[in-house]
Amino acid sequence: MHTAYIPVPTPVRPPSAERWPLAAVAELFELPFLDLLHRAQQVHRQHFDANTVQLSSLLSIKTGGCPEDCAYCPQSAHYDTGVDADKLMPLDEVVRAARAAQANGAQRFCMGAAWRSPKPHHLEAVAEMIGAVKALGMETCVTLGMLRDGQAEQLKAAGLDYYNHNLDTAPEFYGKIISTRTYQDRLDTLQQVREAGINVCCGGIVGMGESRRDRAGLVAQLANMEPYPESVPINNLVQVEGTPLAGAETLDPFEFIRTIAVARITMPLAKVRLSAGRETMSDSEQALCFMAGANSIFYGDVLLTTGNPQVEADRRLLQRLGMRAEGLPCAAGQA
């Protein structure tokens, strides 16, 4: 005789920093895989249409030459990765790329620049880009590095919807990945963004040699923000020759999916986004990520300087899964 399963209601937002202590997040990671996915899917369905994903597109508007020494990044000037330093992309090229992304179904257009911190004249140019993309009817997001006083307010005035600034990893592992920017620097920029009234896009990277507890530490940091980020990109390390992390041990795909599930459980209202590293995932792995609560993907041919599944492949996958892109009337690629 089967006993009916009655789900336990999950709070919408953690009421305080004590809601998700590290030990509690670590316990989620230790759950049997199927139990974890079941719980994450329940939480997901309480707040979202489980068969809908948001499509976002990411354009590098200024590539290479970054003075930071992030061990994973091919755009760092510290490493010889074959990525040349370019100047800021002209406005008309940005608008052309945004139109193409929109034509392919993207709702959010993200613009990334390889800077430690934007200079005033750079910010003025980016503000113009934000206005032009907003005029197309798309959500806007930028990632420009650390912000100085007043810069977040300038971006808000330009109409910016989201600012991306990742924590990358847990505080305990952070020093093994970067030395030119402190963890507190990142938190300070996020606080400026929040105080300016801009939505926060903040996540991290897994597969950099961190432990499962480090992954729990990253999620705990994100979940205990007040409030937690509206958008949480989870990146799977893309190993680039010439960076210190080239040749690192590849993360077990189930560990990546676990990270997605724990992010969904601890941040039930956030958009949990599959970001870098999707091109190495099988369709089955991506489907499990959707089951675990991912509801946004970066969509298009290029994700900054690394590969990303092509548009048609993404459309076919969503169609095979019976899923649809947010804002579109049917499964992506269907008439």
Swiss-Prot record:
Recorded GO MF terms:
2 iron, 2 sulfur cluster binding; 4 iron, 4 sulfur cluster binding; biotin synthase activity; iron ion binding
Which segments cross the bilayer? none
Which reactions does this protein catalyse?
(4R,5S)-dethiobiotin + (sulfur carrier)-SH + 2 reduced [2Fe-2S]-[ferredoxin] + 2 S-adenosyl-L-methionine = (sulfur carrier)-H + biotin + 2 5'-deoxyadenosine + 2 L-methionine + 2 oxidized [2Fe-2S]-[ferredoxin]
Keywords, A to Z, come to:
2Fe-2S, 4Fe-4S, Biotin biosynthesis, Iron, Iron-sulfur, Metal-binding, S-adenosyl-L-methionine, Transferase
Per UniProt, [4Fe-4S] cluster binds at 66, 70, 73
- Give the protein's cofactors: [4Fe-4S] cluster; [2Fe-2S] cluster
Pathway(s) served: Cofactor biosynthesis; biotin biosynthesis; biotin from 7,8-diaminononanoate: step 2/2
> The Radical SAM core domain covers which part of the protein?
51-278
Pfam families from the xrefs? BATS (PF06968), Radical_SAM (PF04055)
Q: Which InterPro entries match?
A: Aldolase_TIM, BATS_dom, Biotin_synth/BioAB, Biotin_synthase, Elp3/MiaA/NifB-like_rSAM, rSAM
**Which positions in this protein are listed as binding [2Fe-2S] cluster?**
110, 141, 201, 273
Free-text cofactor note: Binds 1 [4Fe-4S] cluster. The cluster is coordinated with 3 cysteines and an exchangeable S-adenosyl-L-methionine.
Please give a single GO biological process term from the UniProt record. Answer: biotin biosynthetic process
State whether it acts alone or in a complex, and with which partners, per the record: Homodimer.
Family assignment?
Belongs to the radical SAM superfamily. Biotin synthase family.
Function field:
Catalyzes the conversion of dethiobiotin (DTB) to biotin by the insertion of a sulfur atom into dethiobiotin via a radical-based mechanism.
Q: Which HAMAP family match?
A: BioB
Task: Report what the protein is called.
Answer: Biotin synthase
UniProt source species:
Bordetella parapertussis (strain 12822 / ATCC BAA-587 / NCTC 13253)
Name of the gene encoding the protein in the UniProt record: bioB
